[in-house]
């Protein structure tokens, strides 16, 4: 499974002032959003992940949506939002640190999972997504790279990256096409108004398939980077399970109920949670989820108020004076993947270097 290259390394950019509460530990990633760093709380010694986004034009409605939606979610299977801080050059989003890394990397190292291990992570994924939906938030970009793991022996899955999420309370019904081609539901590709919750189910199904098979269900094995072909196969729901992969009939049935082109007849999350394959070996803490969110509160650290966050975001839209070295770094990391140079520039579809697809509506 291919993914876009990520550049990491020492970054010449301000961390935070010495008087602030976090100390720099190391760089942990970068992307089109900016950079991510591991920091340590000076008071509690807790490790946190900090996502830095350049002040100015990059602080758009997607960033605001990510922060506001993420702030409202408190669940064991969702990376915990802590606060936002304004630095001289960046908006810093402080989050829980998931020391186990990406589920994507775990699958790459293993090749594929056993059915029991895939079910273990799928149950947690469904728990987190179900909670999001109960809070009237659809994620819209569920994928392996957006599912992290904590460092425990039986890893707890953590959903992250709410940049494409949409709230039915705060926002209109989704209509734009966002996400990564391999995970996108057919109705989303058709650019019609759609139910983001049902589209999330499709993406969960892709994640389950990849855990079981070690490959994406709708990619052409001969031409995995041919996104047009991937899209065609999604629209026609053309997938198969390799003959050498042993999967139980119950699991195959669940996958066949998820990969349904018509969202009206696709299985829903409440229905998945009553499916015999899902219920097998279901952890006790996932059986009764009525108080899952409330038990995750942190009384010693009050949640940053919405007014404070909105004020910080507003200030972050004002560009800061920058040094040339940082400008060079950020520009270098926004170069498009050479593999996409020959893609039809006249196409209505915009696919970026990571394989993400966006229709601007």
UniProtKB/Swiss-Prot annotation:
Activity regulation (record text): Activated by autophosphorylation of its activation loop.
Active site feature: 141
Assigned EC number: 2.7.11.1
Domain Protein kinase per the UniProt entry, residue ranges: 22-278
Pfam family, one: Pkinase
Gene3D superfamilies xrefs: Phosphorylase Kinase, domain 1 (3.30.200.20), Transferase(Phosphotransferase) domain 1 (1.10.510.10)
Highest rank taxon of the organism: Eukaryota
Protein name (record): Serine/threonine-protein kinase SRK2I
Organism: Arabidopsis thaliana
